[in-house]
């Protein structure tokens, strides 16, 4: 594993459960934050203005809206989202290869329209909340999660996407198949002994990086800590070892 010169570049802070004022306060406490993730909660409550605010503060944005619809709708959504200045935009690989290819082209066109660098589209594979049992019982899918993730990552890659989102449990075998330029973004990161909340397939930050994760999505472990700045530094220290 290579030495990590700037570990803060490896951490994407999930701004879930926060409003705009909370976000501003967090960024004041931790000015070293480079990447932030804006998900459904924050985007729906605050709208695109929160993205403009984050860009003004020099933050890189992962717009995690997980688009999943018919191909035309997904493509149009990505066309619009690519004009926000977000570096990463997520969509579900289960939307299918046609939707992913159309979305990728639409994102390039949308960014070009406003003279921005096109974002990398990230394919959501299997959410970290799924367990093997619920996967089989609820969806009637007999494949293992690993098999399914491998297949969906292949769809993402073959569709021209810039990477995918997967749990720490799948990072290692995916990295064996894809170069470092293919982003493997990993949520489900916890510090040892912390509450895993509603996620099931989780791991320690240092281990996820060693296994090949490009970046780690970390939310509540930092944002809900009594000392957010200390926790952020702690995670940076862990992954720089």
From Swiss-Prot:
Gene3D superfamilies: Aldolase class I. Its EC number is 4.1.1.23. The active site is at 66 (proton donor). GO terms for molecular function: orotidine-5'-phosphate decarboxylase activity. Pathway: Pyrimidine metabolism; UMP biosynthesis via de novo pathway; UMP from orotate: step 2/2. Keywords: Decarboxylase, Lyase, Pyrimidine biosynthesis. Disulfide bonds: none annotated. One of its GO terms (biological process) is 'de novo' pyrimidine nucleobase biosynthetic process. InterPro entries: Aldolase_TIM, OMPdecase, OMPdecase_AS, OMPdecase_bac, OMPdeCOase_dom, RibuloseP-bd_barrel. Substrate binds at residues 16, 37, 64-73, 128, 190, 199, 219-220. GO terms for cellular component: cytosol. It is an enzyme of class 4 (lyase). The keyword Chloroplast does not apply. It catalyses: orotidine 5'-phosphate + H(+) = UMP + CO2. Homodimer. Catalyzes the decarboxylation of orotidine 5'-monophosphate (OMP) to uridine 5'-monophosphate (UMP). Belongs to the OMP decarboxylase family. Type 1 subfamily. This is Orotidine 5'-phosphate decarboxylase. It comes from Prochlorococcus marinus (strain NATL2A).
């Amino acid at each position: 594993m290579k030495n990590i010169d700037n570990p803060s570049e490896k951490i994407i802070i999930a701004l879930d459960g926060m409003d705009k004022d909370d976000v501003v306060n967090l960024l004041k406490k931790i000015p070293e934050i480079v990447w932030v993730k804006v998900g459904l909660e924050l985007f729906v409550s605050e709208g695109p203005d929160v993205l403009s605010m984050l860009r003004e503060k020099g933050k890189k944005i992962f717009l995690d809206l997980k688009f999943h619809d018919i191909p035309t709708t997904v493509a149009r959504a990505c066309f619009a989202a690519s004009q926000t200045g977000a570096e990463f935009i997520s969509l579900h690989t289960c939307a299918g290869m046609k939707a992913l290819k159309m979305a990728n082209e639409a994102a390039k066109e949308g960014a070009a329209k406003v003279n921005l660098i096109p974002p990398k589209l990230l394919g959501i594979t299997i959410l970290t909340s799924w367990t093997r049992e619920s996967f089989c019982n609820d969806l009637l899918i007999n494949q293992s999660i690993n098999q399914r993730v491998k297949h969906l990552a292949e769809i993402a890659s073959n569709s021209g996407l810039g990477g995918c989102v997967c749990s720490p449990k799948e990072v290692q075998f995916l990295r064996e198949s894809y170069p470092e330029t293919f982003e493997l973004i990993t949520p489900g990161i916890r510090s040892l002994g912390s509450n895993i909340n509603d996620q099931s397939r989780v791991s320690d930050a240092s281990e996820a990086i060693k296994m090949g994760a490009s970046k780690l999505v970390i939310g509540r472990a930092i944002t809900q800590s009594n000392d957010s700045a200390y926790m952020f530094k702690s995670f940076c220290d862990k992954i720089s070892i």
